[in-house]
């Protein structure tokens, strides 16, 4: 059981109590769950699909592997994994039940539900034994975690020796001019778009603020190494709008 704490953390550009952040994040995704996939397409111009395919290309799923997809939401990563890996199994864990409900409905439509398990849970306290999974993925979720080092430590714990971590997350553009243009788009277009599509501007204001606060590629790679992972590498996607980070438990 997690003890109550008066420590603070960030929720976008706001400062909040650590104990409150998970509930705030849960509220964001409860509000947008029904339109989550549509908004991803609109915000990225469909690029999130290309990025997720690039994630699978680098990951190269193998038959009979066991995947844990954390913050797995509506199942995009797990579905891609299972379609490439015969006889593989996947557990999708998410803090927000409404996201998992949407994912289950998609899994039934794609006839993948028999190879999937869905679980409400916290990335910082995974309900699994040590050395339980071959692959751990988290896509556009790690920046929402209250204590990222704790989540990375849990990822390391539940992976088997030889297991692989793969993180897809929005990142920082190395080119200052492109970063400025991207910020203008993010802060001036995405929240109003969220208001029109989901009737929820605030959740998408949080989204763009959380992206801007997330560590750059090298800093996040260092955090992964500190958690114990070896052979940590990253690849920029679309000039650094997003990045893939990979690490191994050896």
Curated annotation (Swiss-Prot):
Source species, domain of life: Bacteria
UniProt pathway annotation: Quinol/quinone metabolism; menaquinone biosynthesis; menaquinol from 1,4-dihydroxy-2-naphthoate: step 2/2; Cofactor biosynthesis; ubiquinone biosynthesis
Enzyme class: transferase
Coiled-coil regions listed: none
GO annotation, biological process: aerobic respiration; menaquinone biosynthetic process; methylation
Binding, S-adenosyl-L-methionine: 74, 94, 122-123, 139
CDD domains to which the protein is assigned, alphabetical: AdoMet_MTases
Spans through the membrane: none
Keywords: Menaquinone biosynthesis, Methyltransferase, S-adenosyl-L-methionine, Transferase, Ubiquinone biosynthesis
Catalytic activities: a 2-demethylmenaquinol + S-adenosyl-L-methionine = a menaquinol + S-adenosyl-L-homocysteine + H(+); a 2-methoxy-6-(all-trans-polyprenyl)benzene-1,4-diol + S-adenosyl-L-methionine = a 5-methoxy-2-methyl-3-(all-trans-polyprenyl)benzene-1,4-diol + S-adenosyl-L-homocysteine + H(+)
UniProt GO MF annotations: 2-methoxy-6-polyprenyl-1,4-benzoquinol methyltransferase activity; demethylmenaquinone methyltransferase activity
Alphabetical list of InterPro entries matching this protein: SAM-dependent_MTases_sf (IPR029063), UbiE/COQ5_MeTrFase (IPR004033), UbiE/COQ5_MeTrFase_CS (IPR023576)
Its EC number(s): 2.1.1.163, 2.1.1.201
Family, similarity comment: Belongs to the class I-like SAM-binding methyltransferase superfamily. MenG/UbiE family.
HAMAP family tied to this protein: MenG_UbiE_methyltr
Function: Methyltransferase required for the conversion of demethylmenaquinol (DMKH2) to menaquinol (MKH2) and the conversion of 2-polyprenyl-6-methoxy-1,4-benzoquinol (DDMQH2) to 2-polyprenyl-3-methyl-6-methoxy-1,4-benzoquinol (DMQH2).
Name of the protein described by the UniProt record: Ubiquinone/menaquinone biosynthesis C-methyltransferase UbiE
Species annotation: Dinoroseobacter shibae (strain DSM 16493 / NCIMB 14021 / DFL 12)
Lineage: Bacteria, Pseudomonadati, Pseudomonadota, Alphaproteobacteria, Rhodobacterales
